[in-house]
Regions:
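Surface-exposed, low-hydrophobicity segments enriched in Gly/Pro/acidic/Ser residues
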Residues: 1-171
Length: 171
């Protein structure tokens, strides 16, 4: 699929992981069939809460760039393991973050990530206070290709975080 530069809508379309980015072309190589063993079965999409009062669906969120990635953007931070699909055990980030009490305390998380793990805010992680969970009507998900399209363009200072579950070949 080729998109002309003037047809692309910046800051609206996002792959859920590198796996989907890396496998997109092979998945759509034989239209109209989609050749993907993965189907997203559940997703939550969180965004910076700008101008909307907090509600029951708002919560504090920390999003990690390399969580669940087999191939990490910053291999010096997390050792890579061999597993083709995104998973919390694809690298040791989830285990380290889950075990660290200071990260699980939202108020001390940034300091701990920066000082202890040498992570960079805005690169390795983003902390979103009072993030708003998007309603299903605010985005479209392509469950086999692993990307979402927001109904509106994100502003440059907004942050998006996702949590999702999937099956591979139905299991």
């Amino acid at each position: 699929v080729y998109i002309k530069a003037d047809d692309y809508d910046d800051n609206r379309h996002f792959f859920l992981s590198q796996y989907f980015t890396n496998n997109y072309n092979s998945a759509v190589a034989s239209p109209p069939l989609i050749n993907s063993p993965v189907i997203i079965t559940k997703i939550e999409v969180w965004i910076t809460n700008v101008g909307i009062s907090a509600n029951a669906e708002a919560r504090n969120v920390i999003g990690f760039m390399d969580l669940g990635e087999t191939t990490t953007y910053d291999p010096t931070l997390i050792p890579n393991l061999i597993d083709p699909y995104p998973d919390n055990t694809s690298n040791d980030l989830y285990g380290k973050m889950n075990a660290d009490v200071d990260i699980r305390k939202y108020t001390s998380a940034s300091g701990q990530l920066i000082n202890t793990y040498k992570y960079s805010a805005g690169t390795n992680f983003n902390k979103i206070e009072n993030a708003r969970k998007l309603r299903d009507s605010e985005y479209i998900i392509h469950p086999q290709l692993g990307y979402i399209s927001l109904n509106r363009r994100m502003e440059d200072d907004e942050v998006l975080a996702v949590a999702y579950q999937y099956t591979v070949r139905g299991s």
